[in-house]
Amino acid sequence: MVEFALIAPLFFFLLFSIIEFGRSVYYIQMLNNAAREGARYAIVHGGPGWRTGCASGPFPATPAYSTAIVCDPNGDKVVAATKAAAVAIIDSTANAFQVQVLWCANDGNIADCPGTHGDGDNGRNQTVKVNVTYTFQPMIAGVVPLPTFTMTGGSTLVINN
């Protein structure tokens, strides 16, 4: 009994630490997957960024069965597609989960993409970059004082439509 009392706290701490580590790796994978799905949505809904009927910026291509232009100047539809792909992240609609969409020139230097949403050019052969950040809260933080930390995921793809 004494041996159990001495070893049990260390054993359970180690056990739950391994579980938390696995959970954090899983969340990182889900963030990368969500960013990739958002970028995939953006690349197949590309088109000229400046068209009559759109104020400015990127928008999905007009569906073949519709005559209306579907504008997405702030990337809200890409953000929605990204959040929908984050199925394993429980609070993906909260402030802990943020998505940034950048449309940039395909010049090999996406780090210099200007502005909040890039340069607004979502034409063919331009790039779209989707960055996802999530504030991870360990489950054992109630027992052991562990801080939250920020995880990131991202995907950069070339627009082909």
What are these regions (language model features)?
Residues A86-F97, I140:
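Short secondary-structure junctions
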Residues D112-N122, I140-V143:
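Short, P/G- and charge-enriched loop/turn segments at secondary-structure junctions
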